[in-house]
């Protein structure tokens, strides 16, 4: 009986020939990522050793640039920690700054066939790179950094096979909203993606879909490796790796097919994304106060390109705030060079530095009482982006940009008729 990609990676990392659902695997961690939030507890100042500084990455993102004295102190602790243990991969405020999962992607820190851990729930973003990546709690991060180990219960796996190609104006976010609306939560399950249609998805699109696996309550989210992925990683990281492919006789809890060509733009209604997706026509015309594009899910260069395409030569509706946050400063620079930033600014958008910012309700776009926002980010539960009375709709960057122009939820289709998104 063969193994899934998740099972293969966990078996290899634990030194076992095989693992099966229900097993507990103690694995070697190839990469441990710490964020600024990791350094809020004072316990990190008391650590006596780091297992392997070359396997540790530190990124300041949730509270960056520091909006409070407490955040500034966390940054200071992180810098001291990096200096004390010789951790060279420190992404401080500056040109190397970014959201942790986006930095991991930009630098190809997540190697195919390996295990990566981070203290953030959206760590499964690295699954786009054929990496078994999971968010873990504070004690488990301490264990990973000091011993190089982590433990996971092996779950059952749901496999999605893609066919076809997305229509113009439909994106990976719409794939997620389709899966979340059709199949609901995947509690205690791994999600794996493959099939002939996968090749039509850009690396950035795969990143979006992998990131949103957290909102399905998935354990791991892993894409099959293909030539595009392997070339992307090798161009950015010289370290050797061994990607994991599923065995032909791998056992899945369920196997599902999705025809990408049949999908359309969707919107998740406020307060939840699971079992909560509707067609845009059902909410079109809903007035909004703010439109946001960013986060580890939708701060990619592809997302900024789509937003710029939609708003080019047009203006954001009066009374509507349109906030755009690139995932990393490197993405910001690339978007600036491509002309996307100028186009967004000309339309009336505000472009912020790379940060989790508005997505986590931290700063740079916090919602006030009773405000309505449409967001291309990670979450829309009550109070996520600010006041608990604010209502948050979730959609693709194209839908968000179209809505910013209208001052109300709008379908992006008219901006993509006759050419590619």
Question: Predicted regions: what is each one?
Answer:
Residues 1-421:
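Fe-S-dependent hydro-lyases/dehydratases of central metabolism
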């Amino acid at each position: 009986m063969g193994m899934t990609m998740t099972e293969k990676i966990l078996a290899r990392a634990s030194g076992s020939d095989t693992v099966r659902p229900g097993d507990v695997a103690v694995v070697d961690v190839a990469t441990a990522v710490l964020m600024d939030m990791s350094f809020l507890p004072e316990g990190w100042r008391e650590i006596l050793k780091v297992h392997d500084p070359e396997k540790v990455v530190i990124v300041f993102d949730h509270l960056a640039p520091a909006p409070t004295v407490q955040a500034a102190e966390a940054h200071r602790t992180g810098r001291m920690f990096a200096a004390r243990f010789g951790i060279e991969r420190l992404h401080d405020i500056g040109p190397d700054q970014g959201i942790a999962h986006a930095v991991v992607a930009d630098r190809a820190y997540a190697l195919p066939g390996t295990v990566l851990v981070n203290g953030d729930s959206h760590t499964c973003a690295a699954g786009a790179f054929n990496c078994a990546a999971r968010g873990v709690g504070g004690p488990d991060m301490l264990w990973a950094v000091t011993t190089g180990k982590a433990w996971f219960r092996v779950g059952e796996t749901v496999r999605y096979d893609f066919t076809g190609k997305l229509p113009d104006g439909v994106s990976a976010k719409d794939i997620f909203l389709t899966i979340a609306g059709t199949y609901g939560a995947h509690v205690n399950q791994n999600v794996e993606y493959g099939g002939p249609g996968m090749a039509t998805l850009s690396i950035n699109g795969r990143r979006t879909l992998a990131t949103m696996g957290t909102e399905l309550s998935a354990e791991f989210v892993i894409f099959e490796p293909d030539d595009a992925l392997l070339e992307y990683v090798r161009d950015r990281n010289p370290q050797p790796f061994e990607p994991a492919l599923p065995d032909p006789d791998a056992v899945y809890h369920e196997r599902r097919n999705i025809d990408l060509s049949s999908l359309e733009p969707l919107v998740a209604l406020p307060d939840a994304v699971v079992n909560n997706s509707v067609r845009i026509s059902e909410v079109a015309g809903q007035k909004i106060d703010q439109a946001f594009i960013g986060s580890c899910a939708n701060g990619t260069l592809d997302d900024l390109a789509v937003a710029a395409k939609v708003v080019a030569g047009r203006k954001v509706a009066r009374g509507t705030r349109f906030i755009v946050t690139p995932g990393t400063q490197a993405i910001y620079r690339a978007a600036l060079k491509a002309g996307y930033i100028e186009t967004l600014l000309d339309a009336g958008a505000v472009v912020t530095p790379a940060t989790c910012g508005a997505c986590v309700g931290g700063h740079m776009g916090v919602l006030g009482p009773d405000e309505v926002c449409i967001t291309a980010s990670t979450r829309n539960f009550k109070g996520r982006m600010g006041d608990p009375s604010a209502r948050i709709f979730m959609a693709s960057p194209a839908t968000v940009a179209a809505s910013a122009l209208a001052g109300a939820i709008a379908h992006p289709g008219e901006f993509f008729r006759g050419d590619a998104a």
